[in-house]
C-alpha cells in the first residue's frame, strides 16, 4: 500500500503506519497474529475458511477505505497471495487514478474497476 496524503491546504500530512496496517488487516480474511499456539491455529484457519477474501476483494476493500479518507490524494494497493495448493501466485493492484473524483460513487466503480488477477 502506497499513499500520498495531504492536509486541507494541500500541505503534507503524516499518516500513522498503524492506520494503514488496520486498513490492510480489516480488508483481509482474518487478523494477522505474530505467534499462534496450536489450539489457536484451528480457530484462525476456520475463520479464514468461513470468510474467504481473494486478492481482488482485498485491494477493493482497502481502496474503498482509503478513498473515504479525505487526506489521501493518491494511493495504490497491491496484494499477492502465494498459493499453497496451486503452482502460481495471485496478484491484484488498484490505483486511485482508476477511481472517480471524490464525491462520486467510489464503491460502485470499485465493483467494475479493472483489477489484475494472475
Task: Kindly give the residue locations of the regions a language model identified.
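N-terminal intrinsically disordered, cationic/polar leader segments
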Residues: 1-118
Amino acid at each position: 500500500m502506497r499513499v500520498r496524503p495531504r492536509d486541507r491546504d494541500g500541505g503534507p500530512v503524516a499518516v500513522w503506519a498503524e492506520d494503514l496496517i488496520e486498513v490492510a488487516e480489516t480488508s483481509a480474511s482474518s487478523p494477522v497474529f505474530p505467534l499462534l499456539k496450536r489450539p489457536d491455529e484451528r480457530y484462525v484457519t476456520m475463520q479464514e475458511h468461513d470468510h474467504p477474501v481473494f486478492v481482488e476483494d482485498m485491494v477493493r476493500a482497502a481502496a474503498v477505505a482509503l478513498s473515504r479518507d479525505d487526506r489521501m490524494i493518491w494511493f495504490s494497493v497491491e496484494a499477492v497471495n502465494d498459493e499453497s495448493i496451486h503452482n502460481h501466485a495471485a496478484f491484484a493492484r488498484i490505483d486511485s487514478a482508476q477511481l472517480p473524483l471524490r464525491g462520486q460513487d467510489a464503491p460502485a466503480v470499485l465493483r467494475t474497476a479493472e483489477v489484475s488477477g494472475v
